[in-house]
Amino acid sequence: MYGLQRSGTNYFETLMHLNYPDATFLNGDLRNEITHKHFRLYPDKSIIPEPQFDNTLQVPDFADFEQQLGTAAPDLYVIISKDPIGWYTSYLRWSKKNNWPKVNHHYIEEYNMFYGMWMHYATQTHKILFVQYKTLLKNPDAVLQKVAAKLHYPVRDAITNTRKVYASKRFTDKKKQDTLNEAYRSELSEVELQDLYQHLNTEVAAFLGYTSGR
């Protein structure tokens, strides 16, 4: 599993462990290790926003990536994404809360590169499954069934859901509805929203299933 911070990776992992306790996840302890779920694979390392994620590794193709993983390479790569606006507003709050260094680029450019790299890899393998966070919230059964089928796990008739997410505060119904109703859009002015759209790679967004930044 891979995804940028604030994309819903913890939520997905929690659901998987509840429903498939034997499922294992590739997630190294160090944030600059290729096995870490937030590892920055994109080639332009100058936009890495937080020093703990700094790395110089260049893995231009999926074969190079799996060669770096070696025997740790999993059977399936689940890539979790949030819609660009939802991700950006959450990421911006997170960067301020954790006192990240100021950057000279728009954060959405990292979104473009992170998911753009996985989009590129997806042209070279069938081992990658892209999952939208909102789909995970609205229809977790369908998502887990799809994952289970790809991993040859038994498909469950009904899944166990959760409000408690590892490494996160209690996930309330209000937070869920705010996300589904896109309440976060009110955090950006029209100027800020247009600035985001100007920097957003619409090809990457469309590939992930988001149109007009959604």
Across the structure, where does each feature detected by a protein language model lie?
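Amphipathic alpha-helical segments that form well-ordered structural scaffolds
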Residues: 11, 15, 19, 117-121, ...
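PAPS-dependent sulfotransferase catalytic domain
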Residues: 60-158, 171-182
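PAPS-dependent sulfotransferase catalytic core
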Residues: 1-56
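PAPS-dependent sulfotransferases, especially Golgi type II membrane carbohydrate sulfotransferases
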Residues: 92, 149, 153-214
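Short catalytic/ligand-binding loop motif for oxyanion handling, primarily in non-cytosolic enzymes
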Residues: 7-13, 33-34, 85-90, 137-141, ...
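Secondary-structure transition/hinge residues
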Residues: 20, 24, 122, 152-155, ...
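Generic detection of long, well-ordered alpha-helical segments
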Residues: 6-9, 108, 137, 141, ...
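Secondary-structure transition/capping residues
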Residues: 23, 27, 98-99, 158, ...
